[in-house]
Amino acid sequence: MSAVSYSMHRTTTTTSSSSHGGVSAGHAAEEFVASAEREKQEMQQLNSRLEVYISRVRQLEDRNKELVIELDTLRGSLGNDIGQIKFKFNDSLVKVRREISEAHSGTIGVEVKVDRLRDDLNDYRHRYEEARREVEREKTTWGGAISQAQAELDTNKSRYAAILDEEKRLYAEQDQLYLQLAAAKDELDAAIVDRRRLQAEEDDLKIELEFLGRIHSQEITELRTLLAQAPADTREFFKNELALAIREIKAEYDKIIQTTRVDLETIFQSKISAVESSIVSKNEAAVFRQEEIRKMNESITTLRAKLSELEARNSALEREANTLQIQLGEDQRAYESELHKRDNALRFMREDCQTLIAELQALLNTKQTLDTEIAIYRKLVESEEGRFTHVGQGVVVAQQETTRLVPVEQDHWDSGEVQTRSSFKRHAKGNVSIVECDPQGKYIILENTSGSVAEDVSNFEIRRVIDGVQAFVFRLPSHLVIQQHGHLKIYGRNSGGINSPPDSIVMESHPSWGQGGQVETFLYNSHGIEKASHIQTTVASSR
């Protein structure tokens, strides 16, 4: 039996996080780093245990070689003393069985450790999702605050524009009031001019009245003189007539004077009243307008103070918004960096788990091979209690290759020859094919042979037929895509696989894919059309 060499590679990634966001995301990142450190220590311990296990397997291999050499020597030198040989190697077989049992116990411990690591990985994934949701919530909160600040800024800008429009309107109204005040002053000047003109007319009428009085007095004097020069009877006649005429003239003169005076006083009083009422109304309007202007000036001063305050607040809000934008960008970059680091860490952990599972599978295969050899040795020793006839040596171990039968070794003894052969054939219609089916029913591998197109295998069906009887049908989950030159490994529930789409998934409905002499595997698309098949035949013969 040839020696088997094993190598383990462990990649440890230490992540560090820097958060400018909330406290929850930073705390989650610190927990993730601490968990990664704990996982590294656990993986180192697991690595040490696997090294011890591998060294024990190598010791078993060396011991097996020694037993094979001793068995060959005994076969060449002894004939009928097979009972002594059995007695001689009974202790060795018991010891080997015990060591194999201990190795199997170690393997179970490794499987338990792998399950625990899988649970830890799911826990880390859950923590990562919680941290991501926390970051999203904080991003939404900051976005709402920025939107509110932006809305308040827009409101302040609109209020500022309204204040500017109000200021322009007040300035225009002030100019209109100044124009009305100038017009009122012009009307006042015109009223003063009219008053002075009427006073001048009154003075002229008074002078004219005085002049007419002097003329009438002179005429009366002349008439009296004439009356004195006339005879008595004539004088008496004219005296009465003259007195009557004088009374009539005086009455008419007084009437004219009174009428003129009343008219002049009425006109003058009406003019004066109109001018005074106009002046009073204009003064009241001017006072009201001055009061309005004063109030407007005070309002403008207040609005300017508020505007300065709003501008300062606007500047502060803009600075805060810029700071929030910068902080949000830094948080986004830190989040993306942390997400990238965690993706890398998860990918490395997944690769390490895949490596450990592959090595564990190799160890299990080696253990199975050792069990087969020990069973053959036991059967050989028990069957050779009588006469031992050496025919040949070899162990047949059938391993699956791509398209050919693989006989490894053969054992011959007097009871006959046992030989196991496996072969398979496959075909595919399209880019997706069944590239491998584990003979022990642990997994099935699908492959996308295209180098440019990703294949969607959502809701595809895998039908398994074992020894002519359909075992079961498994439907692939939705949203499952195989990338270019990618593989999809589908494990049974108890086959030690991990659920990590799109690289590998676990069939939870059955513990394994089953095994038998004639195993047929078919792949159907979602419309029930056959896309690929894999037929594996295992033949065991003895003679």
Curated annotation (Swiss-Prot):
Gene3D superfamilies: 1.20.5.170, Lamin Tail domain, Single helix bin, Vasodilator-stimulated phosphoprotein
Location of the IF rod domain: 39-388
GO (cellular component) term, any one: intermediate filament
Region (Linker 1): 75-88
Coil 1A: region residues: 43-74
Keyword Cytoplasm listed: yes
GO biological process, one term: nuclear migration
SUPFAM superfamilies tied to this protein: Intermediate filament protein, coiled coil region, Lamin A/C globular tail domain
Location of the region described as Disordered in the Swiss-Prot/TrEMBL record: 1-27
Subcellular location field: Cytoplasm
A single MF term (Gene Ontology): structural constituent of cytoskeleton
Sequence ranges of Polar residues compositional bias: 1-10
Name of the protein this chain belongs to: Intermediate filament protein ifb-2
Organism: Caenorhabditis elegans
